[in-house]
From Swiss-Prot:
Highest taxon, organism lineage: Bacteria
Coiled-coil ranges per UniProt: none
Organism of origin: Synechococcus elongatus (strain ATCC 33912 / PCC 7942 / FACHB-805) (Anacystis nidulans R2)
A single GO BP: phytochromobilin biosynthetic process
Documented EC number(s): 1.3.7.5
HAMAP family associated with the record: Ferredoxin_bilin_red (MF_00618)
Protein name (database record): Phycocyanobilin:ferredoxin oxidoreductase
Enzyme class at the top of the EC tree: oxidoreductase
Pfam families hit by this protein: Fe_bilin_red
Catalytic activity: (2R,3Z)-phycocyanobilin + 4 oxidized [2Fe-2S]-[ferredoxin] = biliverdin IXalpha + 4 reduced [2Fe-2S]-[ferredoxin] + 4 H(+)
Amino acid sequence: MSSSTQVGLKEQLHPLIRDLATGIEATWQRWLNLEPYAAMPADLGYIEGKLEGERLQIENRCYQSREFRKLHLELARVGNNLDILHCVLFPRTTFDLPMFGADLVGGRGQISAAIVDLSPTTIARELSNDYIAGLTALPNPTFQGLRELPTWGDIFSSFCLFIRPGSPEEEAAFLDRALGFLQVHCQQAAAATALTDPEAIATVLEQQRYYCEQQRRNDKTRRVLEKAFGDDWADRYMTTMLFDLPSD
């Protein structure tokens, strides 16, 4: 297993993944004051391994800001057969904000799964009126290949979009909608006021923990990591990098 710096992984990935990764980081830079993520595990910035004889590469980019304890963008590639983007923004528990999440999975030139959502891990357990207004104002194209959410998907909002893009036009429309979600989120976060009530903060903490616990039930992700690196490493990666629980 290698943890050396890798240059150019993004450029090897499917164009939609490249474009979404670039757009995500540009949106962060525009709306937020980013700092390096203080709790980044030193050995998990770049990882290499083998999965069924194919080279597995994982690159993690993590930041923090006033509003978010962690902004995580993961890019991964398995040989020439599988490209992955995973992104989650974890609000600080002193901010009553939803969780932005986006995932792309592709292989052999096709995107098989594309999902984006703002999950309402908030005190009211639903998106605020400001979020609803912002999301409703976005262009909302029709997609043909809608996919069914997983059984643990009660964390997702009614705005969740989960598709298998059927054309370059649908890929472009998904990109625009995902970045629209993110811009609404960053705008709302930048304008948000920190919570001071201990009970409210405790409720946000409880909701974030539930979100992370549900996401950890994604058996597909865990199985890939276990095959490549073993059970213990996979568990550590799931709990310290992908869906670490807030402590504050």
